Amino acid sequence: MSTDHIRRPIRRALISVYDKTGLVDLAQGLTAAGVEIVSTGSTAKTIASKGIPVTRVEELTGFPEVLDGRVKTLHPRVHAGLLADLRNPEHEAALAELGVEAFELVVVNLYPFSQTVESGASVDECVEQIDIGGPSMVRAAAKNHPSVAVVTDPQGYDGVLAAVRSGGFTFAERKKLASLAFQHTAEYDIAVASWMQSTVAPEQPETDFPRWFGRNWRRQAMLRYGENPHQQAALYADPGAWPGLAQAEQLHGKEMSYNNFTDADAAWRAAFDHEQKCVAIIKHANPCGIAISEVSVADAHRKAHACDPLSAYGGVIACNTEVSPEMAEYVSTIFTEVIVAPAYAPAALDQLTKKKNIRVLVASEPQDGGAELRPISGGLLMQQRDQLDAAGDNPANWILATGSPADPATLTDLVFAWRSCRAVKSNAIVIVADGATIGVGMGQVNRVDAARLAVERGGERVNGAVAASDAFFPFPDGLETLTAAGVKAIVHPGGSVRDEEVTAAAAKAGITLYLTGSRHFVH
């Protein structure tokens, strides 16, 4: 027979909190219900200042707070009262023999360690905010949840008073509270351990990858479904991470879906790969078009959309600058799932919100430093994020393999094409003219098919354009597909055993060919 519904009356509570939010109301409610309160330091002082009866913990232990408050509750007369399993007659007998009374309720929140670190405090100041007694009490009470209820969040105080009035928490409720308490201390320990590892005692391994790493992920939202309707999905975020797309503010539209987030993330990164005003339009995590402009964001959007208008229908748009009214007016004529930008002109927002279904997001500029994680069966892959910072991403380091050096306008397009490759699933060929993609061949299992696809999509516009390949041409055929369509300059990493054949094909076609020495696979 289940005992989950059985309530345990609350007669005695231990309260020790850094965050005093709601403390007085809680203490008044407990006292009115006949609950004895034992408390520590500033918590006891706050309670007593309102004329509420409180027993200071040093009265209970017979031992004063010492070492600037580092030792307050670490005492057998406290922890015996927390850990005694009142279902066990031997534990009850031991308490009686020791003259120790049990606690049925523990209310504790911890020193603000993470906030102290974020404030830029010194190492010594941060160390002082590593709570010891608080987590010990929380863990003890959570372990002993058959006998004790533990609350770590001031938002739970109304529930405490409601439970007291109802005869105490049920066993089911105490189990839930214990689970939340262990999550709370786990998050705290991960924050401390991560800071110690990165700041106090940084590892000096053979690589930049730590032996251990921890992250705190909290569910931000349940999503309608996953990639497909039969898959459930949710959005999680790390509260300590730099704000990104997961923390974006939605200004308009229905709730985001799993696919909306994956496409928006790809678009957001693609737009910020370029310093000029840039717009990226993404569908199924691949670009329908990317364009830059020195004139206006509306010009960049028109050029990006012109790359592949058919595929852009129902796509996701991202731009790296404020959305103008002119751009918003054009966007509003096209079915668009999501638009994300760092800001919107008021008139632009008014225009976009007239469309019922478009989701309008404002997000902080992506901070791409750090690691990229990918789950695999039984494990996790970690790599440095591709930030377009390899030596070959600087055109000053490119090697001219054949042909005449590119003029400034052609070189600008080659650099744009090369940087755009990072946003395209491999194998990738990107054809560019006048700061805009005009043909994108993506996700092909051989490079010549990627070239054919890019040429097909570019059509007549390919004549006189430039192209980039995210990895080397293993055979001349991919390059020859591009030159036959009229491409006048190409950039690729080089490094194939057939580089000489590829370069010879470029020379025969009379084009300019650059080698970067770096590649940009995306899987």
Curated annotation (Swiss-Prot):
Keywords assigned by UniProt, alphabetized: Hydrolase, Multifunctional enzyme, Purine biosynthesis, Transferase
EC number(s) given by UniProt: 2.1.2.3, 3.5.4.10
Family in the record: Belongs to the PurH family.
Protein name: Bifunctional purine biosynthesis protein PurH
GO cellular component, one term: cytosol
Underlying gene: purH
UniProt-listed Gene3D superfamilies: 3.40.140.20, Methylglyoxal synthase-like domain
Any one GO molecular-function label of the UniProt entry: IMP cyclohydrolase activity
Lineage: Bacteria, Bacillati, Actinomycetota, Actinomycetes, Mycobacteriales
Highest taxon, organism lineage: Bacteria
Pathway this chain belongs to: Purine metabolism; IMP biosynthesis via de novo pathway; 5-formamido-1-(5-phospho-D-ribosyl)imidazole-4-carboxamide from 5-amino-1-(5-phospho-D-ribosyl)imidazole-4-carboxamide (10-formyl THF route): step 1/1; Purine metabolism; IMP biosynthesis via de novo pathway; IMP from 5-formamido-1-(5-phospho-D-ribosyl)imidazole-4-carboxamide: step 1/1
